[in-house]
């Protein structure tokens, strides 16, 4: 019970409770090696892609759009950092629960059955326990209702309930500001610069395939898709908004575009349907080959090289540490010494006190000094 109490009292990590529990279960069943955790991330990505396909239950979209949209989402290179990077599991889990809430919401709007309303509520709460970005779900709920306002009664009570949960969630975070890591380390700040971050990130997200889809739809007749395009673009803005207050970059990092990528996927679903209506096998084959070549090629060349460069400082330290048997003092490194400490604990079975920060004192003996000035 002490562990649960500690988690509940941690303003940052209680908002990542689902990933902590899933990681614990993975460690318990399969060990703390990298492969099981990578497979968990990959498995959740597959679930996420199926949930995108599930948007076909919404008659406005239908499976003729949602299935190709899901295929594009599964293969799109831009957000794969959330899949490959084990530490980004909260991002993927938040997506899964938000999409589950969206699908349940659509069914509730269509049927008004209490079970669907309850499912949407539960999925939303699980999303909030996965990452703070799940708080955008009420905005998605309003967007979906607005697009179908002439067909569905105004769900005022349910949206108000979602809003109350969001308000309580925000209060629980900001009331613990003094102890919240990301509210004290300069990661986020409320300032007008978020507008540029939003615009910059949206344009980057649309490039290149969102731009190609918009150009194709404009050429072939954008009017029949106007509600889809409006909904997709508003979805993107809503999903990017929580990350637009970041201070360490002028754009939203690619792993944080995972939820926003649904908007691009819908645009590509519309574009694929337009290509199919041309009734040209050659055009369809060229379009499919171009999408696959770009996304898979980019992922396995440029992105793969990027991932390799990022992990090399840690691998280099582990090789050094294994040959020295510890303790080691980190005097300079491209990442915080805590990264090396955790890596040594997992890979080498070292105790935490065997990897020291620049000003830490070892319990016994003189530590070897390690300095890495590389910039991966």
Locate predicted features.
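Polytopic membrane enzymes that build or remodel cell-surface glycoconjugates and lipids
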Residues: 1-376
